From Swiss-Prot:
[4Fe-4S] cluster binds at residues 149, 152. One of its GO terms (biological process) is iron-sulfur cluster assembly. The lineage of its organism: Bacteria, Pseudomonadati, Pseudomonadota, Gammaproteobacteria, Enterobacterales. The keyword Methyltransferase does not apply. Keywords: 4Fe-4S, Iron, Iron-sulfur, Metal-binding. Involved in iron-sulfur cluster biogenesis. Binds a 4Fe-4S cluster, can transfer this cluster to apoproteins, and thereby intervenes in the maturation of Fe/S proteins. Could also act as a scaffold/chaperone for damaged Fe/S proteins. It comes from Salmonella typhimurium (strain LT2 / SGSC1412 / ATCC 700720). HAMAP family: Fe_S_biogen_NfuA. This is Fe/S biogenesis protein NfuA. It comes from the Bacteria.
Length: 191
């Protein structure tokens, strides 16, 4: 379910050494399955463990996950990265905003999942997002851009060189992608 690197485990163990005996960590998702989903890690004293929690045992600690958060933390990774600027704890949870779909799910659901878990996190850096409107009978994914992508002069490159290549590689049954957006350049546009 969750992978915690050795460096992150060592970091947590150091922090837990200063807590009440038996305290571990809790990994959770607030607003799971929504565009506003946020992941977090907190201390979990022994009296805060619920009967419905999943206990994930690691070499140096135990991570507790509540029943509601569990499916959204599938494939999550926690790491502790040190570089020339300092140290930072990272938590990547590709399924926090949307539950992972089965490999045999309908094409529409699989494409929507790819957009939400892989493509939109990249576009979010520019204040943008893309939504799947439909998949045509001819096999074209019809997309609509929003936020910083609407009116951006680079949207055609993003669509053809980024999104289309990635989706066609992952979903060979697609023939291409089309942009439904009526682009209006404004202060919200990234470029």
């Amino acid at each position: 379910m969750i992978r915690i690197s050795d460096a992150a485990q060592a970091h947590f163990a150091k922090l837990l050494a200063n807590q009440e005996e038996g305290t571990q960590i809790r990994v959770f998702v607030i607003n799971p399955g929504t565009p506003n989903a946020e992941c977090g890690v907190s201390y979990c004293p022994p009296d805060a463990v619920e009967a419905t929690d999943t206990a994930l045992k690691f070499d140096l600690l135990t991570a507790y996950v509540d029943e509601l958060s569990a499916p959204y933390l599938e494939d999550a990774e926690i790491d502790f990265v040190t570089d020339q600027l300092g140290s930072q704890l990272t938590l990547k949870a590709p399924n926090a905003k949307m539950r992972k779909v089965a490999d045999d799910a309908p094409l529409m659901e699989r494409v929507e999942y790819a957009l939400q878990s892989q493509i939109n996190p990249q576009l979010a850096g520019h204040g943008g997002r893309v939504s799947l409107m439909e998949i045509t009978d001819e096999g074209y994914a019809i997309l609509q851009f929003g936020g910083g992508c609407n009116g951006c002069s680079m949207v055609d490159v993003t669509l053809k060189e980024g999104i289309e290549k990635q989706l066609l590689n992952e979903f060979p049954e697609l023939k291409g992608v089309r942009d439904l957006t009526e682009h209006q350049r404004g202060e919200h546009s990234y470029y």
